[in-house]
């Protein structure tokens, strides 16, 4: 059974409009920040992450005091697991003129000058 539907000129014009140009994927969203006087050029913001992560090498540079032990297991994007060396609490993170307190899980990472070294989760 077929039915005919009468369409006005206005509706017809809406269907004829072209779709907007598709934007390219910007990759990851990064911003500069300062932690303990150390400038981090590219901190990755991940709105789906519920934790903040920093590499052990940066933790050593910052001299933020002893790590608190943790039993947390972090599952990475490739579904592998990593075990943080510990957590450091109440770290001042400066984003432009805003200052936040954040907890960071400290993990061992291979150094790569082109990779982001900090992951900032949902609180940012």
How does the language model describe each region?
Residues 1-124:
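Proline- and glycine-rich low-complexity segments
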């Amino acid at each position: 059974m077929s039915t005919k539907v009468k369409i006005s000129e206005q509706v017809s014009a809406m269907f004829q409009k072209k779709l907007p140009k598709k934007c390219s994927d910007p990759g990851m969203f990064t911003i500069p920040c300062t932690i303990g006087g150390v400038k981090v050029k590219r901190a990755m913001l991940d709105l789906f992450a519920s934790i903040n992560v920093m590499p052990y090498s940066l933790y050593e540079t910052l001299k933020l005091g002893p790590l608190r032990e943790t039993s947390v297991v972090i599952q990475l994007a490739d579904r592998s697991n990593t075990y943080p060396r510990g957590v450091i609490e109440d770290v001042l993170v400066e984003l432009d003129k805003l200052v936040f307190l954040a907890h960071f899980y400290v993990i061992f990472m291979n150094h790569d000058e082109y990779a982001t070294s900090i992951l900032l989760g949902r609180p940012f």
